UniProtKB/Swiss-Prot annotation:
A Pfam family hit: RNA_pol_Rpb1_4
Known function: DNA-dependent RNA polymerase catalyzes the transcription of DNA into RNA using the four ribonucleoside triphosphates as substrates.
Protein name: DNA-directed RNA polymerase subunit beta'
Complex and partners: The RNAP catalytic core consists of 2 alpha, 1 beta, 1 beta' and 1 omega subunit. When a sigma factor is associated with the core the holoenzyme is formed, which can initiate transcription.
Family that this chain belongs to: Belongs to the RNA polymerase beta' chain family.
Keywords: DNA-directed RNA polymerase, Magnesium, Metal-binding, Nucleotidyltransferase, Transcription, Transferase, Zinc
Gene name of the record: rpoC
Organism name: Histophilus somni (strain 129Pt) (Haemophilus somnus)
GO biological-process terms attached to the record: DNA-templated transcription
Cofactor comment text: Binds 1 Mg(2+) ion per subunit. Binds 2 Zn(2+) ions per subunit.
Length: 1420
């Protein structure tokens, strides 16, 4: 028996015996060494006997026997002849599965170039030979000769010759030179290359050249040559002389019924190669004419190309049914390829799926499993139990019992299932909460029952969703399922640390109804001794649920030693709240319950319970909340009737007022006072505002009702209208939806996103007329179409994010860095978008936090900021904190726990081995998919907020202006002439309360440093146009303003007023292209006026579309507008813009018209202009002037003589993250990406913690470009992992050498994934062919560091519970080298080894073996 086990062990080589996977080029000898024989014939199997043909593609002599331990002719059968080679048919007697691993080979009659190294760009062969691909192809496909050895002639090595030139040369020099065609020629050239010498010459060239393109080209070649030298690959191996043949069971021939066969495409492709190869051999033996041989060689080359990568060159070879054959390359790439279909995603045994239904009576850790499913899933366990308890003598008998479904089987099943967790999964699994463990409860019926509270995590509903069940088999798997994946351990969301086990819909409505109060309810003013009595009063009908009463409440408060002490008070509350208090756990304050509970408040309840009382109490509490909510929702009897949609009386007045305003604007437009664009914008604004007013009137109407109180006086109270209650509680629906039911539907968007200017004034209760209905359908259908498209987009974004971040794992506790990022509260306008406490909660302080204005340390560095410490920060009004961040973490190939901070899903400092990269990717990707599915909920109703046109402050304080330049107009008001002015309001403690951006041309009512009071308007401007402000007083003089060339004149028919509109450069006649229309200010004598304090003329260049209403020579005063430029109209805000925006940010794409930033600090001036561009010069205090050409149509934010700082805006536009990184550094680019991504999600009301985005940014900043390599192993301009450079620099610092200088580089997530050090991970992501080609040429090693690589080779991942396993492996490797560890393993193969995996006695084993053999005989 022991021998058998040892034999089986030896058979299966474990995945333990390698640590690195190396990929390289195979030499012909290597291919021959893999092979078990040469395949000489294209035949597959004999059509009569169905036995494989000898020497054919399925030959048993080469590849092994077709049946286990049986040779082909049948002379040797059974196990006893193991290892014998039959002398008759030459087949070795062994297991048939060797046909899956034994390879053959084909000796090619003429060499063939490998298409991957030829055609995969950049062509490696072309790069090595320094020849264009086109030329190499001409040689390979026998169109031209190439000179291999010029000898004493005036030809050059590598020169191409046509047929005529070759014949001429032969006449002239006879045998002096050598020129060939075909792969032999290329192989000879590659073989003759001296890599070392070539490298030397290239290095010298690199030193001597100045041209940038040349440098790049040389560096590319140099890298390729060096990689060949280092990897030990020989260039000539890129041309094959021997072709390996895949084992036959990996390209099977399957008999179908009716005597036909289904075959793998590879067999066809191999057959082609063998046929052509044999024909070529014959032709060579016959010494056939050159032209025939050549043609045959070309065909051989083409057939090998098709086998390796069909369709890469020329037309794809197709099979009988006109579809291209699937080549070897197609087998591994794409979604259906080997990597993604079979290695990263496998089908799993012991699993089933079924429809889900509600299980409202379940506990949180339970799910209902249909008996039928359980019986099937736990089959082997049942067999074992039946046998061990003596109900069945053999497995066969047990099987029969289970099939008969004997009564005893059900008892055993219940026993087996007890405390055996199962996993439930709902596709799509967008985050880790999409798979959770539950304890199964056996139920009748065929649907899985799911606990309602976990639906949010699974994003499940019961409209026909299905879920899959998986059974964890081993003890370890069960342990992990119970300890880590149980639904009760996943109360908080990993994305934002808030509870995800939150009641919704019915439960919320029930609790809301139960905790509402009512004026003059039955039994108001009763005095009750406790919650019990309150319930009694309600049940007996003495009091209503909502009546206001006084109740004695006993709270439990923790004392100094952490024990609960009871405290009793008399509290004003309602009957319902008192009843709800009965389920509150000890230690919760009653104040949290003594309010009307909406969805937010309930979420807060659960959160508080978790933070105060821990996991167990919170789970029980959540369950009780759910049961109570369901019960009282049923009691409330809420339902919706058409009468609940109350239309406000004011609606009709508001609409007619709006219609009058629109008519007025229309009149202004017709009299030429406003342009078409301005009119459109203003109309949209009027309707948007009217819609808001109607909605407000409607909500006021719905949300309140007037009742008579006990004193007989009228009093307002919140309404008990069902629709209002549903929306107000957060159970279903929103104000926006009610607005469409009972207000007005409002503005609609066209499918392209532009807004239709006639709104739908009706609502759904009144009903829509045909036109309105038609307009409505636009939005609704667009929503549905978008959803389908965007789901795919979002899934792809998630995939890219996971791929870029998958190898980021917490690998140490503290990296010891003092770096970090500075956090301040996010203030936009008068609102604090995110308070400082919310941003730093769960982070680790990077520096001591001081009390403002003193040196007293509030919190010392390296402290995890939890809720209590955040309260301290709030109380002391700290306004900026430097916290540790993943982006600044110093750990190589991972992150440290301190830089990451709190594990959001658990609430304590994160553990080592946590896969933070994947969690971050899921947290960002998951809402993307959710949001994509939510566009059509508001039915395309345009929510264009009326554009802001003033700043009205909300707090009293001091006004502060930054980046400000202004002129004072004749009324004494300040007019801004600076572009990015920021206006902040500071309170008496020096805290920023409000923050606004104020545009150019705004009129300010207060100067810097003045006191302002709340509600005051401090600035106004026209939101639809941008003025050009005069900075001096004088007379206007037109410059290059020529009618019909640079401008068009528009005269209004009604008023006779004329205005001048500047044409865009692109629309002008050729003569006007170089003209630059401008307004110049001159004094009364016609002399130029200079802007005060500078030597710059007061001349204003007018961009396209600018409108001038002044006449030539008109007088203007300082601060007055000279011209106005209409601004673009608004589109609808919708995540459609959101999802692509997030993708653009993570891909670090350059925007269409990027902002231009100042490269250095200095004084701006303009140099000589070229045709379409102007020359911007920046002169620093010292050093050389920087110059940049800027297209003339770009609007500049700077004037001549202005001082700019490095990184300042010169021309408006979207900023490019690459520029921000280059000019402002890592912190600025992190801030930019984090804030921009958060902006998109915030718009949708999705909370994601900043650190997830930072994790992705860290991965985008993984690479550096070497700027000065000194004498290190790097090349200048090479792209290297930052961690590698840091390691080298540490070593150099110890040796006292100068440190390698580098610049961080920002890569988009796709690029970053493909640039990862692991080629296995990159190949399984995208562009498999390119990645593998590159890796093979460079002889890359994969250290199996990330998660994907380990999944692919079938190991535990180096994260979570697999983290320790990998650490041990590394220790073993360091201690004894790999050899020892394998020996240790083998010496341990004894009793104890077996015992650890499964226990059985020898008798049992033999009995079972005998039974199996019998069964096999029966089968025969």
């Amino acid at each position: 028996m022991k021998d058998l086990v040892k034999f089986l062990k030896a058979q299966s080589k474990t995945s333990e015996d390698f640590d690195v996977i190396k990929i390289g080029l195979a030499s012909p000898d290597m291919i021959r060494s893999w092979s078990y024989g040469e395949v000489k014939k294209p035949e597959t199997i004999n059509y009569r006997t169905f036995k494989p043909e000898r020497d054919g593609l399925f030959c048993a002599r080469i590849f092994g026997p077709v049946k286990d331990y049986e040779c082909l002719c049948g002379k040797y059968k059974r196990l006893k002849h193991r290892g014998v080679i039959c002398e008759k048919c030459g087949v070795e007697v062994t297991q048939a599965k060797v046909r899956r691993e034994r390879m053959g080979h084909i000796e090619l009659a003429s060499p063939v170039a490998h298409i991957w190294f030829l055609k995969s760009l950049p062509s490696r062969i072309g790069l090595l030979l320094d020849m264009p691909l086109r030329d190499i192809e001409r040689v390979l496909y026998f169109e031209s000769y190439i000179v291999i050895e010029p000898g004493m002639t005036d030809l050059e090595r590598g020169q191409l010759l046509t047929e005529e030139q070759f014949l001429d040369a032969e006449d002239r020099w006879q045998d002096e030179f050598d020129a060939k065609m075909g792969a032999e020629a290329i192989q000879a050239l590659l073989r003759d290359m001296d890599l070392e010498v070539e490298c030397e010459t290239l290095r010298e060239e690199l030193q001597s050249t100045n041209s940038e393109t040349k440098r790049k080209k040389i560096t590319k070649r140099l890298k390729l040559l060096e990689s060949f030298i280092q990897s030990g690959n020989k260039p000539e191996w890129m041309v094959m002389t021997v072709l390996p043949v895949l084992p036959p069971d990996l390209r099977p021939l399957v008999p179908l019924d009716g005597g036909r066969f289904a075959t793998s495409d590879l067999n066809d492709l191999y057959r082609r190669v063998i046929n052509r190869n044999n024909r070529l051999k014959r032709l060579l033996d016959l010494i056939a004419p050159d032209i025939i041989v050549r043609n045959e060689k070309r065909m051989l080359q083409e057939s090998v190309d098709a086998l390796l990568d069909n369709g890469r060159r020329g037309r794809a070879i197709t099979g009988s049914n006109r579809r291209p054959l699937k080549s070897l390359a197609d087998m591994i790439k794409g979604k259906q390829g080997r990597f993604r279909q079979n290695l990263l995603g496998k089908r799993v045994d012991y699993s089933g799926r079924s429809v889900i239904t509600v299980g409202p009576y379940l506990h949180l850790h339970q799910c209902g499993l249909p008996k039928k499913m359980a019986l099937e899933l736990f089959r082997p366990f049942i067999y074992a139990k039946l046998e061990s308890r003596g109900f069945a003598t053999t497995i066969k008998a047990a099987k029969k019992m289970v099939e008969r479904e004997d009564a005893i089987v059900w008892d055993i099943l219940a026993d087996v299932i007890r405390e055996h967790p199962i996993l439930l999964n709902r596709a799509p699994t967008l985050h880790r909460l999409g798979i959770q463990a539950f304890e199964p409860i056996l139920i009748e019926g065929k649907a899985i029952q799911l606990h309602p509270l976990v639906c949010a995590a699974f994003n499940a509903d019961f409209d026909g969703d299905q879920m899959a069940v998986h059974v964890p088999l081993t003890l370890e798997a069960q342990l992990e399922a119970r300890a880590l994946m149980m639904s009760t351990n996943n109360i908080l969301s990993p994305a934002n640390g808030e509870p995800i086990i939150v009641p919704s819909q019915d439960v919320v409505l029930g609790l809301y109804y139960m905790t509402r109060d009512k004026v003059n309810g039955k039994g108001e003013g009763m005095l009750l001794q406790d919650s019990r009595e309150a319930e009694k009063a309600y049940r007996t009908g003495q009091a209503e649920l909502h009546s206001r009463v006084k109740v004695r409440i006993t709270e439990y408060v923790k004392n100094a030693i952490g024990e609960f002490e009871p405290q009793t008070h008399l509290v004003d509350t309602t009957i319902g709240r008192a009843i709800l208090w009965m389920i509150a756990p000890k230690g919760m304050p009653f104040s949290l319950f003594n309010q009307t509970l909406g969805k937010k408040a309930i979420s807060k309840l659960i959160n508080e319970s978790y933070r105060r009382l821990g996991l167990k109490e919170s789970v029980l509490f959540a369950d009780h909340i759910m049961y109570t909510g369901f019960a009282y929702a049923a009691r409330s009897g809420s339902s919706v009737g058409i009468d609940d949609m109350v239309i406000p009386q004011k609606k009709y007045e508001i609409i007619s007022a709006a219609e009058e305003e629109v008519a007025e604007i229309q009149e202004q437009f017709q009299s030429g006072l406003v342009t078409a664009g301005e009119r459109y914008n203003k109309v949209i604004d009027i309707w948007a505002a009217a819609n808001e007013r109607v909605a407000k009137a409607m909500m006021e109407n719905l949300s309140q009702e007037e009742v008579i109180n006990r004193e007989g006086q009228p009093e307002k109270q919140a309404s008990f209208n069902s629709i209002f209650m549903m929306a107000d509680s957060g159970a279903r629906g929103s104000a926006a939806q009610i607005r469409q039911l009972a207000g007005m539907r409002g503005l609609m968007a066209r499918p392209d996103g532009s807004i239709i200017e006639t709104p739908i004034t009706a609502n759904f209760r009144e009903g829509l007329n045909v036109l309105q209905y038609f307009i409505s359908t636009h939005g609704a259908r667009k929503g549905l179409a978008d959803t389908a498209l965007k789901t795919a987009n979002s899934g792809y974004l998630t995939r890219r994010l996971v791929d870029v971040a998958q190898d980021l794992v917490i690998i140490e506790d503290d990296c010891g860095t003092h770096e970090g990022i500075v956090m301040t509260p996010l203030i936009e306008g008068g609102d604090v978008k995110e308070a400082l406490r919310d941003r730093v909660l769960g982070r680790v302080a990077a520096e001591d936090i001081l009390k403002p204005g003193t040196n007293e340390v509030l919190i010392s560095r390296n402290t995890l900021l939890d809720e209590k410490l955040c309260d301290v920060i709030d109380e002391n009004s700290v306004d900026s904190i430097k916290v540790r961040s993943v982006v600044t973490c110093d750990t190589d190939f991972g992150v440290c726990a301190k830089c990451y901070g709190r594990d959001l899903a658990r609430g304590h400092l994160i553990n080592q081995g946590e896969a933070v990269g994947v969690i971050a990717a899921q947290s960002i990707g998951e809402p993307g998919t959710q949001l994509t599915m939510r566009t059509f909920h508001i039915g395309g109703a345009a929510s264009a907020a009326a554009k802001e046109s003033s700043v009205q402050v909300k707090n009293t304080g001091t006004l502060r202006l930054t980046n400000v330049k202004f002129v004072t107009n004749k009324e004494g008001k300040l007019v801004l002439t600076s572009r990015n002015t920021e206006l902040t309001i500071i309170d008496t403690f020096g805290r920023t309360k409000e923050h606004y951006k104020v545009p150019y041309g705004a009129v300010l009512n207060h100067a810097d440093g003045e006191e302002v009071t709340a509600g005051e308007t401090v600035a106004n401007w026209d939101p639809h146009t941008m003025p050009v402000i005069s900075e001096v007083s004088g007379f206007v003089k037109f410059v290059e303003i020529v009618d019909g060339l640079t401008v068009t004149r528009q005269t209004d028919e009604l008023t006779g007023l004329s205005s001048i509109v500047v044409q865009d450069v692109g629309e002008r006649a050729t003569a006007g292209k170089d003209l630059r229309p401008a307004l110049k200010l001159v004094d009364a004598q016609g002399n130029d006026i200079f802007i005060p304090g500078t030597d710059v003329m007061a001349q204003y260049f007018l961009p396209g579309k600018a409108i001038v209403t002044l006449d030539d020579g008109a007088e203007v005063f300082v601060g007055e507008p000279l011209a106005r430029i209409p601004q673009e109209s608004v589109g609808t805000k919708d995540i459609t813009g959101g999802l692509p925006r997030v993708a653009d940010l993570f891909e670090a794409r350059k925007p269409k018209e990027p902002a231009i930033l100042a490269e250095i600090s200095g004084i701006v001036s303009f140099g000589k202009e070229t045709k379409g561009k102007r020359r911007l010069l920046i002169t620093p205090m010292e050093g050389e002037t920087y110059e940049e050409m800027i297209p003339k149509w770009r609007q500049l934010n700077v004037f001549e003589g202005e001082l700019v700082q490095r990184g300042d805006l010169i021309s408006d536009g979207a900023e490019t993250p690459h520029d921000i990184l280059r000019l402002r550094g890592v912190h600025a680019v992190t801030d930019y990406i984090v804030n921009e991504v958060q902006e998109v999600y915030r718009l949708q009301g999705v909370k994601i913690n900043d650190k997830h985005i930072e994790v992705i940014v860290r991965q985008m900043l993984r690479k550096a470009i070497i700027t000065n390599a000194y004498d290190s192993e790097f090349l200048e301009g090479e792209q290297v992992e930052v961690a590698r450079v840091k390691i080298v620099n540490r070593k150099r610092a110890e040796e006292g050498k100068p440190l390698v200088e580098f610049e961080r580089e920002l890569l988009g997530i796709t690029k970053a994934s493909l640039a990862t050090e692991s080629f296995i991970s990159a190949a399984s992501f995208q562009e498999t062919t390119r990645v593998l080609t590159e890796a093979a040429v460079a002889g890359k090693r994969d250290e199996l560091r990330g998660l994907k690589e380990n999944v692919i080779v079938g190991r535990l991942i180096p994260a979570g519970t697999g983290f320790a396993y990998h650490q041990n492996r590394q220790k073993n490797r360091l201690v004894g080298g790999m050899e020892n560890t394998t020996e240790v393993k083998l010496s341990a193969v004894d009793e104890e080894e077996i015992a650890s995996e499964f226990t059985f006695s020898a008798e049992d084993a033999t009995a079972n073996l005998a039974e199996m053999l019998n069964m096999a005989d029966d089968a025969e």
